[in-house]
């Protein structure tokens, strides 16, 4: 019985790791990348090639979108793990 409980705890830890911890670490990493991108924009010379500027903006926008999706995912996982309110539909919490 003890081995069964330990294996369930291990499985629950892996579920929490892949649904909360790993996305949170990814979001933190993306936040650091965004900070570096924005700091780099301040020091850019005004003679940058137009293509490089567009590529840089697209990369920054992509990081912002990914960061937003990950933080939204984490919020939904937390809401799914908490008791559902009567006003809230459980189906709206699913991705």
Swiss-Prot record:
Result for mutant: residue 81 to A: Increases accumulation of full-length MifM. Reduces misCB/yqjG induction in misCA/spoIIIJ mutant
Localisation: Cell membrane
CC terms in the record's Gene Ontology section: plasma membrane
Domain of life: Bacteria
Chief localisation class: membrane
Region listing for Crucial for elongation arrest, in residue ranges: 86-89
Bilayer disposition of the protein: Single-pass membrane protein
Assigned keywords, A-Z: Cell membrane, Membrane, Transmembrane, Transmembrane helix
Outcome, altering residue 67 to A: Reduces misCB/yqjG induction in misCA/spoIIIJ mutant
Spans through the membrane: 12-32
Recorded consequence of changing residue 89 to A: Minor effects on translational arrest
Functional description taken from the UniProt entry: Sensor protein that up-regulates translation of the secondary membrane protein insertase (MisCB/YqjG) when activity of the primary membrane protein insertase (MisCA/SpoIIIJ) is limited. Acts as a ribosome-nascent chain complex. When the primary membrane protein insertase activity or level is reduced, the membrane insertion of MifM is impaired, which induces arrest of MifM translation and unfolding of the mRNA hairpin. Unfolding leads to translation of the downstream gene, which encodes the secondary membrane protein insertase MisCB/YqjG.
Name of the featured protein: Membrane protein insertion and folding monitor
The species this protein was found in: Bacillus subtilis (strain 168)
């Amino acid at each position: 019985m003890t081995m069964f409980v330990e294996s369930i705890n291990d499985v629950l830890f892996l579920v929490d790791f892949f649904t909360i911890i790993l996305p949170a670490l990814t979001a933190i990493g993306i936040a650091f990348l965004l900070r570096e991108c924005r700091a780099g924009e301040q020091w850019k010379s005004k003679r940058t090639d137009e293509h490089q500027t567009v590529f840089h903006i697209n990369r920054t926008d992509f990081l912002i979108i990914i960061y937003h999706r990950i933080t939204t995912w984490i919020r939904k996982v937390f809401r799914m793990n908490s008791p559902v309110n009567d006003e809230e539909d459980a189906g709206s919490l699913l991705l």
